[in-house]
Swiss-Prot record:
One of its GO terms (biological process) is translation. GO terms for molecular function: large ribosomal subunit rRNA binding; structural constituent of ribosome. Coiled coil: none annotated. Gene3D superfamilies: Ribosomal protein L11, C-terminal domain, Ribosomal protein L11/L12, N-terminal domain. SUPFAM superfamilies: Ribosomal L11/L12e N-terminal domain, Ribosomal protein L11, C-terminal domain. This is Large ribosomal subunit protein uL11. Disulfide bonds: none annotated. Forms part of the ribosomal stalk which helps the ribosome interact with GTP-bound translation factors. The gene is rplK. The keyword Ribosomal protein applies.
Amino acid sequence: MAKKIVGFIKLQIPAGKANPSPPIGPALGQRGLNIMEFCKAFNAQTQSMEPGLVLPVVITAFADKSFTFVLKSPPATVLIKKAIKLDKGSSKPHTDKVGKITRAQLEEIAKTKTKDLTAADLDAAVRTIAGTARSMGVTTEGV
């Protein structure tokens, strides 16, 4: 018989940098999960990735205090900032522009995000990522 699921925990954690401090410790502790076991498993699974790259993770907590977790692709905003070497987006995105991104860069980001997007094809995914870029105050070229 399948284990009874008691909840899902969604977090965004830098690759290879999971530790028991907030927000990880309190979120897992509320469900009675082994915090250090999660931190070791997460860090082991993300050691081949770029250190510090923010990754969304969905942790499934079971009634017997065990858990599983699924890593998602990094948020589009993080990938856009990395592609054009930005620290943060514009506070007034429609008036203050902070950079430019090309179609080739958008396609690269869309390919990275394909498994987590609901877009029908690459072109639709590129348009989705371009919309995110525009909402950050980044000018899109060739879209």
